[in-house]
């Protein structure tokens, strides 16, 4: 008698594990795609930050500061920053603007760039990155 009770199966619970698998599998796939999208986009943003930072510091080295504190800005700083950016940039980034001169009352170069998100789960979009390279004492091209 006990064995008959233990062996009886309830017909109401038939296919429960299949239904659970059918519901959870697409949700897990979406979750994993979301994580992959975030990771690839984050790596792209970090690479764009590195390229923008390098080009901002290269452009800042073209700024000259006179002994009286006057900042001499030429178009050469913008050109050098753009040249460095375009030489190093990955295919999914683009240069938006370069502005070398006085930034926050200090000699610096501001580079603004954009990178495309991965677009695996969400639609691809542009992520804006800004980098400032300040001129440090003794780091102009003439001092090297």
Task: Please place each PLM-identified region on the residue numbering.
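Short, conserved structural patches
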Residues: 3, 46, 65-144
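Alpha-helical assembly-interface signal, strongest on the long, hydrophobic N-terminal helix that forms
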Residues: 2-78
